[in-house]
Each structure stands twice: as structure tokens, then as C-alpha cells.
């Protein structure tokens, strides 16, 4: 890792069908072995399932799910004087979206169901309704930060 300069953020282009950067981020998080066309197909299928179930715009459901599952604060390990402290840190917007999509992805893969599209659609609907495992994970992160708020002065 170079110390000379920070890496530039790459521009994320919106996907061709929904014209949304969030859908592109979700596709990139669902990639397996670099097979983007497969990831794209089951995400589009999941968005169609959401549209059938909810009867509303699937992009709004996706945005609401990401908004509900984005943590505001997280803990990071910081080693000070031989002991490691869990230091609460505020989450930047782009990191929050990344964390939310990562959690939605992992819990949708663990769900019971026939296809990955159905699992993902159900997880996104649950997250949009503020239920399910993704919301529990966010609340757990907030509880960890609350429990360790005594170490907030170790922030860097």
C-alpha cells in the first residue's frame, strides 16, 4: 500500500436498465468469480419480484432498504499500550452504503428459499420494512458503539 498518495475513487456508472448507481453497487457486491452477467440477471429478477410483491417501484424499495440498514456508527479496533480497544467511529456515507449492501448480500445468501433472486428480494423487502437480520445487525453495531463510548476519545 503506497504511502505517497491516496487512491482515486473510481467512477461508478449507473446500470443500463434502472439507471441507478445503487443497483450497480449491488451487482458488484453480488459478484461471484467475476461473472457479472449472472449477478446482473438475478438482481434484475429480484427487482421484478419486488415489483410484483409490493406493487411499487423496486428502486424505492431498494433505496429504503439501504437507508434502513446503513449503520451510523461502527467500532474499530485500536491498539493502545498493549491493549486493544473497540473505538466508536462515525461512518462516512459511502462506507455506510457499502456496509449495508454487504450485510444485505450476506444475509440474503443465508436465507431459505429456492433461488438467490427470491432470497434477495425477500431480504430487501424485510430491510425496507425495518425487520429481518440486516436491521438486527445494524442495531447490534449501534449497541457495540454505545457500550464502548467510553473509548471515543481514542478516535483517530
Curated annotation (Swiss-Prot):
Q: Which SUPFAM superfamilies match?
A: Ribosomal protein S7
Classify the main location.
Answer: plastid
Q: Which InterPro entries match?
A: Ribosomal_uS7 (IPR000235), Ribosomal_uS7_bac/org-type (IPR005717), Ribosomal_uS7_CS (IPR020606), Ribosomal_uS7_dom (IPR023798), Ribosomal_uS7_dom_sf (IPR036823)
Coiled-coil residues are none
Q: Which cellular compartments is it found in?
A: Plastid, Cyanelle
HAMAP family reported in the protein's UniProt record: Ribosomal_uS7_B (MF_00480_B)
> What is the stated purpose of this protein?
One of the primary rRNA binding proteins, it binds directly to 16S rRNA where it nucleates assembly of the head domain of the 30S subunit.
Q: What is this protein called?
A: Small ribosomal subunit protein uS7c
Organism of derivation = Cyanophora paradoxa
Amino acid at each position: 500500500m503506497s504511502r505517497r498518495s491516496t487512491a482515486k475513487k473510481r467512477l461508478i456508472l449507473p446500470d443500463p436498465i434502472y439507471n441507478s448507481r445503487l443497483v450497480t453497487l449491488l451487482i458488484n457486491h453480488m459478484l461471484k468469480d467475476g461473472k457479472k452477467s449472472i449477478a446482473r440477471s438475478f438482481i434484475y429478477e429480484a427487482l421484478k419480484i419486488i415489483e410484483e410483491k409490493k406493487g411499487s417501484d423496486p428502486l424505492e424499495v431498494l433505496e429504503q432498504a439501504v437507508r434502513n440498514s446503513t449503520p451510523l456508527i461502527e467500532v474499530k479496533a485500536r491498539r493502545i499500550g498493549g491493549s486493544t480497544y473497540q473505538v466508536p467511529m462515525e461512518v462516512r456515507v459511502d462506507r455506510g452504503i457499502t456496509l449495508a449492501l454487504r450485510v444485505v448480500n450476506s444475509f440474503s445468501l443465508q436465507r431459505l428459499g429456492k433461488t438467490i433472486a427470491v432470497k434477495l428480494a425477500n431480504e430487501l423487502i424485510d430491510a425496507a420494512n425495518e425487520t429481518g437480520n440486516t436491521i438486527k445487525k445494524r442495531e447490534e453495531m449501534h449497541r457495540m458503539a454505545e457500550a464502548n463510548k467510553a473509548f471515543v476519545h481514542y478516535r483517530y
